[in-house]
Design a protein with these regions (language model features):
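A short loop-to-beta-strand structural motif that recurs across blades of beta-propeller domains
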Residues: 41-43, 92-94, 136-138
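Conserved beta-strand positions that form and line the central face of beta-propeller blades
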Residues: 53-55, 92, 105, 149, ...
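Conserved beta-strand position repeated once per blade in WD40 beta-propeller domains
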Residues: 17-21, 64-67, 114
């Protein structure tokens, strides 16, 4: 019987989030998600729990690992807050070498991206939308090249009935520095000269 042993230990002075480890080469290497430096990033360990290198770094947030291409030694992951002048809540798919080189955005565009990849990490099904756009689904290769549109929602009936998209907005917090993001839903018969009650949720 194989004995259990601790491979990786992580600690913080605050509440600690965790994500599943990704095994590479049947456990000869491990990819860990950690918030140890105040941002969520990926770290590469050997099978004994020795840190080999950081994979990602910077003032942005890795959310989760999507796929590891072991043959090319590339990890695909979802992250947010990296793209300047975009809503930091919007997730994108990125790829980077396990040695931390070659970081590349796979799903461009100021949208929230939900993705799935095939077992060989060759193709990406990219579902993307915002509250003020019509959702679409594209098939892409793993470098981010669009191959075809798979589906686009039909909003014609809603628009004909008077539907209007909500309006995203950005304001400064009380500190005058921090950006706050929100969405405004107006009545479909909105009159800019009238007064309306506001529900802050």
């Amino acid at each position: 019987r194989r004995q259990r042993q601790m491979c990786i230990r992580d600690s913080m002075n605050t509440y600690q989030e965790v994500r599943p480890l990704a095994a590479v080469g049947d456990g000869k290497e491990l990819i860990q998600w950690s918030e140890r430096d105040g941002w969520a990033h990926l770290y590469l360990y050997d099978g004994e729990g020795n840190l080999k290198n950081r994979i990602t770094r910077g003032p942005w947030h890795v959310d989760q690992i999507v796929k590891v291409d072991e043959a090319k030694r590339v990890v695909y992951f979802l992250a947010n807050g990296k793209e300047k002048d975009e809503n930091p809540y919007y997730e994108h798919l990125y790829r980077v070498g396990l040695d931390g080189s070659g970081l590349q955005q796979v799903t461009p565009g100021d949208y929230f991206h939900t993705v799935s990849m095939d077992d060989n990490a060759a193709f990406v099904v990219n579902n993307y939308s915002r509250v003020n756009t019509i959702p679409r689904t594209d098939l892409m290769d793993s470098n981010g090249r669009k191959l075809m549109t798979l589906e686009e929602s039909d909003f014609s009936g809603l628009l004909a009935a008077g539907y209007q998209f909500p309006e995203p907005f950005k304001v400064k917090a009380a500190d005058g520095v921090t950006d706050l993001y929100g969405v405004m839903y107006k009545p479909f018969n909105f009159d800019s000269t009238a007064l309306y009650p506001i529900i802050d949720y």
